[in-house]
């Protein structure tokens, strides 16, 4: 179990999980608020 924790805490694994979550969040925001870059909020 110790080796699994060490593996999951390495930079490539953490970066992959982080960028995957960030991409999913941006996709969901873009789904509910499309064209947010073209029409700025008042």
Curated annotation (Swiss-Prot):
* Claim: Plastid is one of the keywords in the record: yes
**GO biological process terms held by the UniProt record:** photosynthesis
One Pfam short name: PSI_PsaJ
Q: Which residues cross the membrane?
A: 7-27
- Which terms are listed as keywords in the entry? Chloroplast, Membrane, Photosynthesis, Photosystem I, Plastid, Thylakoid, Transmembrane, Transmembrane helix
* Bilayer disposition of the protein: Single-pass membrane protein
Q: Name one GO cellular component term.
A: chloroplast thylakoid membrane
Q: Where in the cell is it found?
A: Plastid, Chloroplast thylakoid membrane
Q: What does this protein do?
A: May help in the organization of the PsaE and PsaF subunits.
Its family remark reads: Belongs to the PsaJ family.
Q: What is this protein called?
A: Photosystem I reaction center subunit IX
The taxonomic lineage of its organism, from the top, reads: Eukaryota, Viridiplantae, Streptophyta, Embryophyta, Tracheophyta
């Amino acid at each position: 179990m110790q080796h699994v924790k060490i593996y999951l805490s390495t930079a490539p694994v953490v970066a992959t999980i982080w960028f995957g979550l960030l991409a999913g969040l941006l996709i969901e925001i873009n789904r509910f608020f499309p064209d947010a870059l073209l029409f700025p909020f008042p």
